[in-house]
Amino acid sequence: MSVSLYDYYGQTRTATDPFNLDHWRDDCKPHLPWADNHFLERVSGAPLNPGATYQDWRHGASAHSFTDENGQFNHTYMERMWPKWADKLGVLQTTDDYERQMLIVDPLRVNRGIRGEYGDLHDLVKLLVREPHTRQAYLPLYFPEDTGASGRKPCTLGYQFILRNQRLHCYYPMRSCDYANHFRDDCYLAVRLLLWVINQCRIADPLGPWNDVMPGSLTIHCTSFHLFANDFIALCQEESNLWTTS
C-alpha cells in the first residue's frame, strides 16, 4: 500500500557560498557519510559494479538480494555515467579493479550505440568546454535496454546542464522517487554533480569563461513522487513528537 503525495515543491535555494558543501549538507540533509562516499564512486571515471559504498547504505543489507550470481546489480549509477567499458571488465568494486582491467582490455571493444561510441560524463564536460552555451549537455541514465526489460530500472532518467548568464543550471528528470528514503540524497547528489561539472570545466579550460560561472538552479521533475504507508505513519509520529516536545 502506498500513499500518494500531491504537493508541489517550487522552492529555490540561494547560497551566499554555493561551493561550501557544509551549506548543502545542512540544506539537503543527506545520509552522511554515505552520500559523500557514494558521490566519489559516481564521479570516479570507472563503471563500478557493484562498487563498495552500497554496503554502507542504510538499506545495504537488503541490497544483496538484488545482485546476480556474480554479485553484480543489473545497473549502477557508475555504469551509466561511465558506460564505455561497462560490463566488459568483470566485477568492479574499486577504481583499482578498474585500472587493472584496463591494462588488458581491447581498446576496440568500447560499447557502441547504433551509430557511434557511447559518451560519458567526461564527454559532457568536454562538450560544455567546447560549446559553453550548448543545449545538448545531457547525460542519460535510463538506457534503451531498460525499456521492456524485467527487473530494476534507474529512477533517474538523466541530468541536463545548461549555461545561461554565467550560471550553470541542472535539470533533473526522474521517473520515480521515494520521498522518505531517497529524496534527500537525490537532491544532494545532484547538487554535488552540478558543482563537480563546474569545477571540471574550470580545470579543463582554466583561461576560459568558467572561472566566472556560478551554480544556477536545480530543477527536479518527478513523475511518481511517492511515500509508502509505513513511512507516512513514521513521519507523522515524528512530527507529533516535535510538537509535543516544543
Please give the residue ranges for each predicted region.
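Terminal, non-catalytic protein-protein interaction segments that mediate quaternary/complex assembly
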Residues: 1-246
